């Protein structure tokens, strides 16, 4: 909308001269213009700048200025020629009597026009190259006004910047132009920098550059490289600045050693007035590294990287109306060609619509300044708007123009606000320093806090030096230190090493001492987790012969309560340094130095009513706090059991103990307990209450407390969810009152088991508070003092400030002490005399009986089932069948047992088998084999289940079989000493399934063809021989080669299997002598078998066992065969 408005205004301007009828009451401003057509056309040429005047007039009218004025323009092209300027000045001022003269835009020419203005008392508006300091002299040029600052102020700003960065060695470079503008500026800057009253700066090189002479530029830059690292540059046009960036990039002058400072007074900073660039700054200008042609030249990257090493000192360029500046740039060419300018020269006709002259914005601002002053004076008195004595004070003002913030001083020249510009990471120009100069005084303010990150971030954060460390030629590097002082260093090094060794030794001893002291302090409270062990019960291994017997078991340590129970669930009884201790587990956390120092103090905390903190174990998955054992358990447990009678004095002493412990904690470095409950009040052998779980701080905060634990929490803690570090000691007083109510009523907290409200409802009502607060009901005995109950009620007051202090509680309790009863132990002993001989004895005896019976039951169960299976059954879990890839099964049978049994009585048979199998059971335990069952004279064992052992099962079975054979050789039947007991053993290896069968009298049974084949190996074996299948033989020889001697039996017809090759186990090979450590009778092979034996074998393969074998093995076959 704003651009549309200005477009409509411009169209109105272009047609105003032909269509508008001027009323007689309007006044006309006659403006004489001394313009340049060919001189510096890109900067002050009328074709690129003149269009700003009609646009400025309409902009003034849009702001409410010059509304009663028409403007007439009278043009003279003086080209900055002195004679032409003098002629035009005489014409404008003497003949035409204009109101104001605009221009000329060159310094020398403006001096002539200013001289004429002093004679004819006409106002002259200076713009362009008019920064000479002499033009601001009001004595010589009283009627010259300009929005340009003087070059002297630029020199002062440069001096302050060099002083701020401590740069005292610089080079000055400037581009040559037709009017020698940059040379004049650099002369003023050089003169200012040479002022002895200012910061001393040495100018080591001053050179001229030419935009069309690259050779001169290269040679000049090479000369600068050998003399300076801080370069001050003056350039007029954008192409000159860009060419300089490309040149220093080519000469490798864009390293971190160089700082290039562009000096300008055109309020453009890093910008250029063109609309061809791809990027624009916030003020509407195009960055100077962008290409100024329609087709980019490919040097944008190099130019931009060179711009990183450039700073800019310029007049404040913060244009407030960037949108209008873009509008001015695009429409200035049309405005100069159309009425009222009507410039019809070839330059005007061919003027570019994409850019404007460098000083066009200054022409706009200086005429805007004049228009405002005329309007203000006209508003007061329309007849005196041309009176310079009245007009000039109106021009001493400030406004936001197209060149930034403009402030005009008493000399009608601009009071400059210079800024040091730099580039940020996004290549946006930022103001780093603001400098204001007026009447030789200056004010400087930094716009950054970190110089390295703000000013020198393209220099890796380090301010460059104006002189390299090694000089400009690199010949002045310091002499190598070793070359100069080598011998001295060698001698000094020996002495120094010797001294260092002594110092290191001393330092080492000191460090060692400190470390030892630190380790000693840590060892006081840090307990290795390996030193905390659970109290073990001594057990005897059960055997087959005495499967129902159990030896006595003892529990280490002495306690009034059992180790497995009797304490609150948060406590665990463990052994530490042969003493029973109480432990609590906590989440692990990272402890700081303060926490560790607190635990050192905590361990040293001693009081009769505080439980001793022994230490903390921090090397396990959880932290474990270790406390001294209090054998009678917690106060909560004692109250819950309800088997101890407490009279009034006893309850009073318990409450007093708690109060004394709490008071001591409140006066200590801990200041409070923070977790006070009846569960944290332990009772020792002497019936003395000791507070525990204090001082753990952050460890307790890691836990999420249960609802029941919060029953002791104060209302303010519940409402604010306060941590221990945020709690007040009054919260402990509230918890003390709840514990006291438990003691006085002899019931658990809040009598929760008998209340209709649950824990959640009670906590909600406590947290809610109000006039009718909920508290535990005190149903008391007659012997309880009313003063004590009153104290308890005061302690659980709703407001923390209404609760008494712990010290006051102790004082009040001491005043309530009953006379004549001062020793709790005497009182307790008297009270417990009647229970000592009965109650505890009965409890201990029943406990022992229960433990003994449980042990017997466990032993009996372990005899029937594997330990793992028994544990799962005791836990009520279902035992699923489990498959095993490879196991070894053994069947054994007593040869001619029927005949042997016929010679014995039934009791003798039982004793015979018991003696035989008891020793077999011992052999089984030695080899880690599991005995499945024994039925009659049959024996079934397996290895590899229920615990898998790789391939060791074949070795264990074979070794056990050889032991069986050895034992049978020496076994004697007591009542038949001449009879010899022989075994027939069969072995097979393979997969198997095992599981528990039945609910009543459950048995651990084996299923699978592996079991059946092992049975066939036994039934087809020979007396005193170990018969194994080919699968078992392969497993034995593959995994234990050369350890056992075996022999092939050859192919044998096996019932249900057909022809199988089987093997005999002869014995175990001694690896040193290659002899047999155990050897059975040499086998009979198919080659040396008698014909009668072969026939017998065939009959046995197809004929069932005798009746004794079938009847004796019927139950076992049920378990073996699937």
Curated annotation (Swiss-Prot):
It is a single-pass type I membrane protein. Residues 508-1122 are cytoplasmic. Keywords: Cell membrane, cGMP biosynthesis, Glycoprotein, GTP-binding, Lyase, Membrane, Nucleotide-binding, Receptor, Signal, Transmembrane, Transmembrane helix. It is found in: Cell membrane. Expressed in both ASEL and ASER neurons during early embryonic stages and becomes specifically expressed in ASER neuron in early larval stage. Residues 536-562, 1071-1122 are annotated as: Disordered. CDD domains: CHD, PBP1_NPR_GC-like, PK_GC. It catalyses: GTP = 3',5'-cyclic GMP + diphosphate. Residues 542-830 form the Protein kinase domain. GO terms for biological process: cGMP biosynthetic process; chemosensory behavior; chemotaxis; intracellular signal transduction; receptor guanylyl cyclase signaling pathway; response to salt. One of its GO terms (molecular function) is ATP binding. Its EC number is 4.6.1.2. Guanylate cyclase involved in the production of the second messenger cGMP. Unlike other guanylate cyclases expressed in ASE neurons, may not play a role in chemotaxis responses to salt ions mediated by ASE sensory neurons. This is Receptor-type guanylate cyclase gcy-5.
